[in-house]
UniProtKB/Swiss-Prot annotation:
GO biological process, one term: cAMP-mediated signaling
Sorted UniProt keywords: Allosteric enzyme, cAMP, cGMP, Cushing syndrome, Cytoplasm, Hydrolase, Metal-binding, Phosphoprotein, Repeat
Name of protein: Dual 3',5'-cyclic-AMP and -GMP phosphodiesterase 11A
Phenotypic consequence of D355A: Induces a decrease in enzyme activity due to the inability of cGMP to bind and stimulate enzyme activity
PROSITE patterns noted in UniProt: PDEASE_I_1 (PS00126), PDEASE_I_2 (PS51845)
Species per Swiss-Prot/TrEMBL record: Homo sapiens
Amino acid sequence: MAASRLDFGEVETFLDRHPELFEDYLMRKGKQEMVEKWLQRHSQGQGALGPRPSLAGTSSLAHSTCRGGSSVGGGTGPNGSAHSQPLPGGGDCGGVPLSPSWAGGSRGDGNLQRRASQKELRKSFARSKAIHVNRTYDEQVTSRAQEPLSSVRRRALLRKASSLPPTTAHILSALLESRVNLPRYPPTAIDYKCHLKKHNERQFFLELVKDISNDLDLTSLSYKILIFVCLMVDADRCSLFLVEGAAAGKKTLVSKFFDVHAGTPLLPCSSTENSNEVQVPWGKGIIGYVGEHGETVNIPDAYQDRRFNDEIDKLTGYKTKSLLCMPIRSSDGEIIGVAQAINKIPEGAPFTEDDEKVMQMYLPFCGIAISNAQLFAASRKEYERSRALLEVVNDLFEEQTDLEKIVKKIMHRAQTLLKCERCSVLLLEDIESPVVKFTKSFELMSPKCSADAENSFKESMEKSSYSDWLINNSIAELVASTGLPVNISDAYQDPRFDAEADQISGFHIRSVLCVPIWNSNHQIIGVAQVLNRLDGKPFDDADQRLFEAFVIFCGLGINNTIMYDQVKKSWAKQSVALDVLSYHATCSKAEVDKFKAANIPLVSELAIDDIHFDDFSLDVDAMITAALRMFMELGMVQKFKIDYETLCRWLLTVRKNYRMVLYHNWRHAFNVCQLMFAMLTTAGFQDILTEVEILAVIVGCLCHDLDHRGTNNAFQAKSGSALAQLYGTSATLEHHHFNHAVMILQSEGHNIFANLSSKEYSDLMQLLKQSILATDLTLYFERRTEFFELVSKGEYDWNIKNHRDIFRSMLMTACDLGAVTKPWEISRQVAELVTSEFFEQGDRERLELKLTPSAIFDRNRKDELPRLQLEWIDSICMPLYQALVKVNVKLKPMLDSVATNRSKWEELHQKRLLASTASSSPASVMVAKEDRN
């Protein structure tokens, strides 16, 4: 199938409709010489400042003077192009040009536009949150190596500009970009309309209706209506006024296109500051009368009507003669505008009844088109506002650490949303205080303000007069105290406004909108204020609603930033406090030197390899030397290259970080470590466990109860302590013990693991955590069933990691409960210490928490100790040591001691039962009575 051939005109039309494709092609295929020629030609074209020569055949009508006093025909349009040439004999249509610029619109279906999909944009949005370093060119490419350096550099810069990763804000903007485009239908040419007017009025009328029905842009629609009305009634000038302020009850007739000449070929430039607007008060003049009463006014001689205002004629020199004014209604009959035709052509003729009928037929269609365009404009405005609010949220989440930065972003967004001259944010000094006092003020002026206003603003800020006015602003104080927004349309007419301060500042305030800023707890933390809309109008209800919605997000952002600042200060205080505590929690240099120089007794002298070691045989210093001996005896100092001075310092600091509680103190930690050492050396576990595992369990034993407070995990949960809030209610204390051990290791001069390899260090810290957490009896109950089954079935395998983990956990528990394996006198003494500590916890539960403690913590039930010890041994201790004996028979002396101690507790329990029975018998009661007598 042969490809269709395109002529140059079709290609040019296609590129006009799709400029992004042309730009893409130029960026990829354009040459430097082409760009230089383009720059040279256009710089020459812009060099002459004189008027351009007029086009041949331009009608005299195109050179007539409009009421604004400017030439219509002989200049250039907004884009610098000359006006189009009218049809010869164009007087038939009142001198209307052939094809004005708005007639050259094209159907933009957008099918060939290159757009990133929503999915890809979302991915880019997520990727932009991370920091990437991208190379924007391929270092291996050498095809352009022969080009001049300037050209290579220029190409690299172009690539860099187009390939750098976009910011989060840009990607969000692309994601929120509206995919709804205004349909653009090219209207029929004016000369064709003139032809239809002469030969087929019905078709002529339908063409005019069709052209406005397809236009949803209010500006171009208004301009079309003016031109078409001029064309229909042969008027020299035409104006269109639209009703504004109906919702607020203050109607005004506003026209951005006033007295448009029928021969104007281009759509006039609209001013961003609405300098071309003409406002007519409701009910004033002929326009206001028609708008208020809805009547048609047809005046042959305007100067004979008392309602006519000739001020415009005096200013422009244009004389108004005949005038036809008619209301424009919406589909429900509401007046939404007024159309005015001036000076019937030929000059001096009045507008006829036929003109009135034609306008009456055409304006209802105009009303429908205007209503649709206004509805579309309102929806676009709401979309832009919603989009702006989402961008505000993005700004707030991107910056939550610096109050000044986030407030500046807020003020910049507020100015963009509300198009105001100034924006202020004032923050309260104390949100809890009933007295309103602002402590901080932030001010931003719009860049669209005049230079004089900006200079006045800078001078007032330098003199601090305006800052003082902000801090002592009575309107802001009122809003902060009542929590209600204030919207003042005319500041000088409002008694709440301080006019003197306004005059001193040199900035004239016309309108004020001030709303409170709330935090997440619905407390007022400040106020936000905007002044003077750029268009000169007061802030309306829509502005107020938008500003209040905007300030909700701003309040959350400011509150988060303030909270971050408070957390940052708290963190700094905590760092200082920890620094002070770590200084006092570490041992002194004299202590380290003392043990560093001391002679360490042998294992046999200390008897630390005995399973039945006396827990109370060594004093606090002797326990340090014994711990040093254990490290040396196990070969850990040599194997892991532990600095001896560091080891001494670490042991002394660990001892110092145990609290002076009755049982869970340094002596208990040492005794647990001693029993682990004895089991490793006596039972031969030293040959089964790796050196890293041995180091982990020895260090774990010494650190397993660091900073113990004498209360258990259940008490932490019941009391809602800081530890429970920090670590949760699962193994609360054990997590704290591990973290405390890590803190000591990370302190300067305490890292006994400093010479380990990276892998050894990582493995060791994981094993250390497992060892300390294993002392939680909850975890013991979870894992012991599996351990017992493995042992009873003979399926235990030292090569399986999970089996080794379970075994180490059981060893830690066996050592932690090891007092029950000691001789009776030692075991009983330890049991009494544990019970005393439990009783102190029970007393706190009763006094502080108003709870009745369980039997083991209840001092009033201390005589039940033997029974409780029997339950303890039978349910927890005995099964564990029985299983360990099955693993290694050398541990049988421990099991025998448990059985012996159980029999002792059984004897005490039986004696208590006999005593209880005897005290409750009748004979004992009689004996007691006789004793009393």
